[in-house]
Amino acid sequence: MTKADLLFKDNITKIMSEGVFSEQARPRYKNGEMANSKYITGAFAEYDLSKGEFPITTLRPIPIKSAIKEIFWIYQDQTNDLAVLNDKYGVTYWNDWEVGHTGTIGQRYGAVVKKHNIISKLLKQLEDNPWNRRNVISLWDYEAFEETEGLLPCAFQTMFDVRRVNGELYLDATLTQRSNDMLVAHHINAMQYVALQMMIAKHFGWRVGKFFYFINNLHIYDNQFEQAQELLKRQPSECNPKLVLNVPDGTDFFDIKPDDFALVDYDPIKPQLRFDLAI
């Protein structure tokens, strides 16, 4: 059993046995009903990517190709334009969060990255002094929230640190998330930001180190309890999945493409489960 599978089962068990129910939830199911959830607070996980520990379960198939494309939309294209996400990457799931008829998700995510020139500043800081302790990406922008409507960012802060071990430099990353749908989005969000970590490490020719993941509110929606029990019954696959970035060390961050990533040794348990999402 991989570390990701062990943590997945532990978190599902903890939510179902110790979690409390939300009240006055904002999200709605497609039938208009309030989408409440059972949740725990303060969930934390640590993965040592350099030792082959990756945050992706084998208990069900996790579609990370589209998730990685979303990272490119946010941090390379640096836009909130849904047409870019739809036409360039073939990803449409953000369309449910379109603000009015603007064709955007409001001043969120990529728009905030562009507004503050976040990636270029981060890369410059790491180039000037890899050991500085100020390598922070924050998408929590109150001014932007007041400017337009839109879903507030869930994965809103990422921090990076560099370590020298036996003469090699390792890039560590910490992702902070205010809210996470355990069964649907947990491993998608984690692997997205592992991909971002790998892109930054490749830019400098460093190795990827540890990935730390903190979630304030980790939940299972009240229409997903049957799927939760099914996942607990499943025995994990014997595979040991790893994400690989197939570009030379020193490849510029903005020259990396989604197809440069490959998920290897991944043979998840099937069939896939169906989820009615809360919007």
Curated annotation (Swiss-Prot):
Substrates-to-products reaction catalysed: dUMP + (6R)-5,10-methylene-5,6,7,8-tetrahydrofolate = 7,8-dihydrofolate + dTMP
Subunit structure: Homodimer.
Pathway: Pyrimidine metabolism; dTTP biosynthesis
InterPro entries from the UniProt entry: Thymidate_synth/dCMP_Mease (IPR045097), Thymidate_synth/dCMP_Mease_dom (IPR023451), Thymidate_synth/dCMP_Mease_sf (IPR036926), Thymidylate_synthase (IPR000398), Thymidylate_synthase_AS (IPR020940)
Coarse class of the protein's main subcellular location: cytoplasm
Entry-linked CDD domains: TS_Pyrimidine_HMase
Family: Belongs to the thymidylate synthase family. Bacterial-type ThyA subfamily.
Record-linked Pfam families: Thymidylat_synt
GO MF entries: thymidylate synthase activity
Entry GO CC: cytosol
UniProt cross-references to PANTHER family, sorted A to Z: THYMIDYLATE SYNTHASE 1 (PTHR11548:SF1)
Active-site feature positions: 154 (nucleophile)
Database matches in HAMAP family: Thymidy_synth_bact
GO biological process, one term: dTTP biosynthetic process
Name of protein: Thymidylate synthase
Subcellular locations according to the entry: Cytoplasm
Keyword DNA damage: no
EC number in record: 2.1.1.45
Protein task: Catalyzes the reductive methylation of 2'-deoxyuridine-5'-monophosphate (dUMP) to 2'-deoxythymidine-5'-monophosphate (dTMP) while utilizing 5,10-methylenetetrahydrofolate (mTHF) as the methyl donor and reductant in the reaction, yielding dihydrofolate (DHF) as a by-product. This enzymatic reaction provides an intracellular de novo source of dTMP, an essential precursor for DNA biosynthesis.
